[in-house]
């Protein structure tokens, strides 16, 4: 409840700020299937171009509290880390073998919540072409909890005067439609991970075409 109330406070007070910083224009792969209104449990996946991808996602889906997995790099910062925890950020230490955050995600989903994940796991470095290879955590979580996946792609066009950020929301991926009973759990996780990455790549191309059209 606290995270929800704090989210609403930040969204209401921060709306004018995000408008000038991002001024996000939102497109849809198919609005009749997936809009900005998320009902029930879901896993939101996004490409990862900037630390500002999270607030863009937060304001893209304003009616829900997005519980994003966040790395130790930001969560260990004294002020920022506390602020992100208050918003509902889920601490993920990529340098350890502590997977307790997955149990926390499962609990949130069991209560109808929304988990946010950037499956690339980190920002691309100079010379790397995004999207990077996907980690398998999002696929594992979706399959074990039978949770629909909502894909989202952003162009990372933030803080640019007289330019807008652009986001496209894709149609949901139902993990049960992807899973093959003839495959092992590991193979199904790898298969769903490939499907998710292919979807993000496809949405990225679609977003590029839509922005050119205006």
Put a short name on every predicted segment:
Residues 2-5, 102-214:
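Non-catalytic C-terminal accessory region of glycerolipid acyltransferases
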Residues 30, 48-49, 63, 72, ...:
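Short, flexible active-site-adjacent loop segments at beta-strand->alpha-helix junctions, enriched
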Residues 26-29, 77, 99-102:
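Structural motif corresponding to alpha-helix initiation and N-cap regions
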Residues 95-98, 131:
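A conditional alpha-helix N-cap/helix-loop micro-motif detector
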Residues 36-96:
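Catalytic core of membrane glycerolipid acyltransferases/transacylases, capturing the structured
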Residues 30, 97, 155:
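Residue-level "edge-of-site" marker
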